[in-house]
Amino acid sequence: ALLIAAAGAHNLLFSGPPGTGKTLLASRLPGLLPPLAECEALEVAAIQSVTSCVPLSHWPQRPFRQPHHSASGPALVGGGSKPQPGEITLAHHGVLFLDELPEFDRKVLEVLREPLESGHIVISRAKDRVRFPARFQLVAAMNPCPCGYLGEPTGRCSCTPDMVQRYRNKLSGPLLDRIDLHLTVAREATALNPTVKPGEDSASAAERVAEARERQQKRQGCANAFLDLPGLRRHCTLSTVDETWLETACERLTLSLRSAHRLLKVARTLADLEQVDGIRREHLAEALQYRPATQ
């Protein structure tokens, strides 16, 4: 899922008990992302200069912002008597990581819905309106319940069904719809001498991400996650049979239209990682697996 998120700039939500590596996985994402293009780097530098924070040593690297869950609305989205950019603007062309997502103020999280769609945030004051860029990739992490141990085989969870429901209701459906990849991180058995499973190293994974991003840039001028509706219709076409299959799947899983569109974007990224032009049934099926289980 991390590779897919990096390849298509998709929003990603990790869910799992404490100590399963959710934060560690999120911190690995910047290492998979391609460096900033020159025009992107200039935009990032201009934003950071407003806050008197220009880390020239990180010039080609994408921003990675990790605000605390106690952050206020102005700190996260921007504001003040003289409007200043918030964390979502400082994460422009980079990653915004929100750990313990349900612990953030719900009203603050709801404000994220607009920039997640438009790529900018508008701050209104009595005399004027200020528009800041906010084209960021959202990565978030959360526990499955207030105590964090729901579903653990040890039976440690002490939460009642009502407590679990109230905890999950802190995140609205429209906000969750804007997250492309929902991944449950399970706890693995602890071993003093764990067996290392062969897998893809970071360098080769980053190379695949760079190749996929280059395909997207040449084809449509942006990452798949940022495709608008006309771009989606043009670059995410399906065969008649697969389109019918997807419509049936969306009806059975009661997916919203926005969820279906984001599913198509993920399928487009899966095809790009395989370096194929067309979206196939297996790409759609895999993308469906990353929708929330509750749907």
Regions found by a protein language model. Give the residues of each.
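Basic, amphipathic alpha-helical bundle interface domains used for macromolecular binding and assembly
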Residues: P83, R106-Q295
